[in-house]
Amino acid sequence: VSLLFDEFIKLEKATEKVVVSPPQVQQPEIKASGKRIQVNLLDSLKANTTYTIDFSDAIVDNNEGNPLGNFTFTFSTGTQIDTMEVSGTVLDASNLEPIKGILVGLHSNLNDSAFTKLPFDRVARTDSRGRFSIRGVAPGKYRIYGLMDADQTFTFNQKSEVIAFNDSLVIPRMEERIRMDTAWVDSLTYDTIVERKYMHYLPDDLILRAFKEF
């Protein structure tokens, strides 16, 4: 995957921040040169699957270091792109503080054993506020888990790993909403208010509480 930007850019902590979904067991090679980012996916790609490459705030401009926040590139190996999103927050169960950098994943296999035996179907990573958004999700029913994935297997296989979960089934959906946009004449006077329709993805308020087994 080759991405061309309109200014010189660089990557910061790409191995920590960039998340490919579905997850890649063999970590991708990600390099920036001039105005271009090259992503080499080393795992075989699944057929008829939507892939997302979430850069978080890893892309910054070369001069001032300003991040291009929440940039995600999406492509499909099939004829359509899945567009559903699932969002929420991961909190430390002991003090309800947000947890940064924990992996959050969906399983379409609803058996509890899937968390320990199968890699996630789709993944995201939490930001500094503990927020996550899993993109490119297909319609269906899912279990959702959080995992501080020490060995990068995308499965819970070490009791030392921090985990999180939500008891409810996750069923992605979307609804049409209206956003009010204002056209201003100057800083004090507005000209018109325009209603714009957009699609909002749900659920967007999932709470996962993280803990470590003893």
Question: What are the functions of these language-model segments?
Answer:
Residues 153:
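Acidic carboxylate motifs that coordinate Ca2+ or other divalent cations, activating on Asp/Glu
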Residues 1-129, 133-136, 141-147, 159-174, ...:
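Acidic, low-complexity Ser/Thr/Gly/Pro-rich repeat segments typical of extracellular/periplasmic
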